[in-house]
UniProtKB/Swiss-Prot annotation:
This is General transcription factor IIE subunit 1. Belongs to the TFIIE alpha subunit family. It comes from Dictyostelium discoideum (Social amoeba). Residues 358-375 have a biased composition (Gly residues). Residues 377-386 have a biased composition (Basic and acidic residues). Pfam families: TFIIE_alpha. Recruits TFIIH to the initiation complex and stimulates the RNA polymerase II C-terminal domain kinase and DNA-dependent ATPase activities of TFIIH. Both TFIIH and TFIIE are required for promoter clearance by RNA polymerase.
Amino acid sequence: MSSSNNIYHILDDLVKMVIRAFYPDEYAVIIDGLLREKKRIKDEDLALRLRIQQKYVRKILMDLKGDSMVKSSDVKVEAKGPNERGSTHLLWYIDYKHIIDIVKYKLYMFRKKMESVKVQKIDVQTYKCQTCHKVYTALDIPKLLNMDTGALACEICDGELEEELNNESLTQTAKHQSDLFSQLRKIIEQLKKTEGHNIPLFARDLADLSADQGPSYTINTNSSLGMGPKPSAFPVAQGAATSHHIDPTNENIEFHVDILDTDGIEINKAVVKKENKKTGLASLPPWLLPSNSFKNRNVKSNSILNNNQQTQTSTNEQPTAVKEQIKIDQDFYINYIKTHYQEWESAPDSGDADGNGSNSGSGGSTIEGNDGGNGEHQNKKMKLDDSQTVSSMSQSDDDGKDILVRVGDNLIPITKITEHDQELMSNQEYEDYSHALYSYASKNVFDHQYQSLMSN
């Protein structure tokens, strides 16, 4: 209690010193009466206690409010009875913290103004009229110069101007500055006494205003790697038996918010990138990768159908959302492939190494995915030998018609093309590889997906 009373005495003395240094006596009387109340008060009540007219008290309070020395707030008073009306009162009070900031700012502006005046006295030469004693600066010389005589003449009385020595004015300025700061020394010392203290409120009822503004929140964003249960943001409310009331007037309420990682998204990206380097199918969409081939999809669809049948026999619920979700996704993918790969779907599966349009089952060399074998794409280098064609066609039922792509002088299956092989390809070889890749995807993935959907 002694420390709190001490800081109140320091702040009250500071306000009294500032008012007595820069304002008339009647202002000091109003401030002293306001300091004695230590609460928000109406101007008519303050006028009754000081025995001064209300309009005079309000005028002084408005002047002090313009200088940020006092503050006011509108408080709504509810009606007590059914026949009464609610009213709004204007209450006046002092904000200690705001006054400290205002006094520091005004002292800084005083010092800055005195320094600017001192610099102006040194840098700017002045001239004084001997007749009317008007003072001019060096900036006024062009309009004061007489072109006939070449002398400086006063623009008011045409008197002669003489150069004024700035030593006396500098001495007066320095003396005035020292006198000012000697008078303000007590205020500066009183300001230093407030440093290191917690500035209290002027009145207890002001605590309601700070509570209405809400407490300040501090969020502790500690990341968590686990997927365990999240701790409650309000530790006091975890148990009903140990729940307590949160004080809304508390200045700091700390919330512990655990931010989980992004569920291993970076790990999944790294795995897909590694598989693409091995298979060379980086340009395919994710749902057309070999890992999502029709064989795996058939196994997954069979397992899902078995699980759905078991759940339907055990319960009378509707089909699970997993089957519907897969069906919707596959329809979307089918429409996507139809629109983007319609050119390769409509093209005949023909073309050989010699440019003759033969069937894919013939003994000649076959190029999978060419748009017509009538000499339109004879410049393509993606060709097959007779022996390789026979071996590839013999394995067409098991391997899904694996296509050989030319990389320089070598022929490599399309599913084993790597990024290094793509870099070694020429422009024409890479174009042929792209056409063959999309043709391979549309034939081996789309057809089997469509058949599996039709069977379901």
